[in-house]
Amino acid sequence: MSDVTTAEFNEDGKYIRKIRSFVLREGRLTKGQSQAIEAHWPAMGLDYTPQALELTQVFGRDADTVLEIGFGMGASLVQMAKAAPEQNFIGIEVHKPGIGTCLSEAGAAEVTNLRVYHHDAMEVLEHSIVDGSLERVQLFFPDPWHKKRHHKRRIVQAEFVQLIRRKLKIGGVFHMATDWENYSEHMLEIMNAAEGYKNQSTTGTVVERPEHRPLTKFEARGHRLGHGVWDIMFERTA
């Protein structure tokens, strides 16, 4: 049994810490995922501690660092790390099968600039990531909680984006993507009201998908069916 902290917010966007316990059963993992964790966790896994992470020690170099919150199965994160060997990448994911698949693909791709946490992103950000240390924070396709009464559960809230701002360097970018138009509107509303940020869109709305974000199979299928995807990028200015 593992205690994992999950994010929840009240109607004013105030972060509420709640502890939810659930069983992380090995039986949920495929044989390949289990083998990948056993083989690659020693080199690529980061065990959560409430102490500040020394990035130069973790990666053995001083380089721009990109952090992704909730990388799912990790395919696009591995692609990004492979395509930008000059950068460091950190992924955070709470679901163990995603960790296993990501490590499997990272091992096959022979990437050396990727590290992953199996922990809640809020705790990692609050306690392990040094303020002003990140070049980019990525939040791709978070749960939209599409029912209005559930909007308070959306991770993008006023307090959350200020936590992200603290962790970004001046000039660093918070990059969000969603395939739910209402959530993109919510993201823009929160970000436009947030101090210390500037929208990178010349129109003050969304941006075209940047080259650094790979086109996923799910997204490509959505495009063929006429479904939209909205990318939002805000730069830390203060």
From Swiss-Prot:
Pathway(s) the chain acts in: tRNA modification; N(7)-methylguanine-tRNA biosynthesis
GO MF term list: tRNA (guanine(46)-N7)-methyltransferase activity
Active site, UniProt feature: D143
Cellular component annotations (GO), alphabetically ordered: tRNA methyltransferase complex
Reactions it catalyzes: guanosine(46) in tRNA + S-adenosyl-L-methionine = N(7)-methylguanosine(46) in tRNA + S-adenosyl-L-homocysteine
PANTHER family per the UniProt record, alphabetical: 3-DEOXY-D-MANNO-OCTULOSONIC-ACID TRANSFERASE/TRNA GUANINE-N 7 - -METHYLTRANSFERASE (PTHR23417), PENTACOTRIPEPTIDE-REPEAT REGION OF PRORP DOMAIN-CONTAINING PROTEIN (PTHR23417:SF14)
NCBIfam families: tRNA (guanosine(46)-N7)-methyltransferase TrmB
Family the UniProt entry places it in: Belongs to the class I-like SAM-binding methyltransferase superfamily. TrmB family.
Name assigned to this protein: tRNA (guanine-N(7)-)-methyltransferase
Organism for this UniProt entry: Shewanella frigidimarina (strain NCIMB 400)
Taxonomic lineage from the root: Bacteria, Pseudomonadati, Pseudomonadota, Gammaproteobacteria, Alteromonadales
